[in-house]
Amino acid sequence: MDTSTPAQPAAAESAAAGPAAAGSAADSDASAADAVVELSPAELPAHLIEALGTERAAEWQRDRTPYNPRVWMLDSPTGSAATLTSGRPNTRYTKLVDLWADSDAAAQALLGTLIEASAERGDAALKWQLPLDSDLPAFAVDLGFTALRDPISSADGTQGVRGFVLWHGGWSHEQLRYYGQTTLFTCGAVAAMTALSHLGLEPFADTEDEDARERELAFWRSATNFPACEPLGLAVAVHDVIAQSASAIRLELHLDTTAPTLLETYEGEERIFREQLQEQSRAEAVSRGIQQHTAPLSIEQITERVASGELAILLIEEEPMHDASTPHWVVAHAVDGDTVLLNDPWITAEQGETWVDSHDLPVSIAVLDQMVAFGDPTYRGVIFVAR
């Protein structure tokens, strides 16, 4: 048997407890865990490279920095199996990128070990990525894996891959429709449009839509500070979409500074004209009745509102997840205990990520508290939307 996901992406870190199904899988083959060897992709043994084939082995060994790629190998009386996992630092999931096995029994035994290790690490979920033409093995269905909502074909990493997830302990929640930003700078537009779509305004269609990118760029043009979307301009753009729809969606802007934002790298005229644009956005916000709440907003206040059903469009610092400091916009849409689910428009496809990494992305509240702060001195930008 060759149970396989495409040798493409990856993602990881975590919080939660293992499900009963996972426990039974681990208990039924306690010796399997003892026989599993964990190593880096650079250490692939010759016999596994031969079993995978040259092209597939090269995919296992591609550079996935900084997303913690690991290879797990099992040799047992029931057969041999190996899997590649990966995951973003400081998150609460592990992604199964590819699984090879010469028997169902070996594949199931290794999967049981991965589930147990994921739960022990504190993950909220173990994700599994599969090619569109591959089915989830029956034993994975029995263990509790369920399908992730199909994405809209958009950024690199949204095509050719299906996603499945096992929530340790279970987590019932609505999934947002995933759309990956198609430029380096449209994260704010995509985050806002994703949130509004979930509330019924459908800036993105329910099905693949060849006009989606045009709407992404149009929304960005209405909000941009060239090229980033700063909180005031983004709030104005969101307000205008809501107003045009005559819907009952509420918007609330929290930005705990009155100084210009996201201009840390600009000087001279490059900074001056962007400051002027932000002043125009501020005036437009006032003319529309958008109040800027400048009181500091705690992470507890954010997560409590998300837990109650609101969506939070968050300005974050990406460094904890990507080992590089960059401002970014994401949507927080569900909370369970001390874990928050994010919808992240960004996919680092060149390092093996796909939409499976960025959709329903669990992080701890403590890590989110660090991320929802950008600049020096730091400021916190949050736009709440809800019906």
Describe the residue ranges of each PLM region.
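Acyl-donor binding region in acyl/amide transferases
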Residues: 91-144
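Conserved catalytic-core motifs of GNAT/GCN5-like acyltransferases
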Residues: 146-160
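Noncatalytic regulatory segments and standalone regulatory/sensor domains
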Residues: 118, 122-123, 128, 133-139, ...
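Active-site acidic/histidine clusters and adjacent loop/turn architecture
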Residues: 258
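Active-site nucleophile-adjacent alpha helix/oxyanion-hole segment immediately C-terminal to the catalytic cysteine
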Residues: 167-228, 233-242
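Short amphipathic alpha-helix that is part of the acyltransferase structural core
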Residues: 1-13, 27-61
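Conserved donor-binding loop and adjoining core beta-sheet/short helix segment
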Residues: 63-112
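Active-site-adjacent substructure of cysteine-protease-like catalytic cores
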Residues: 270-341
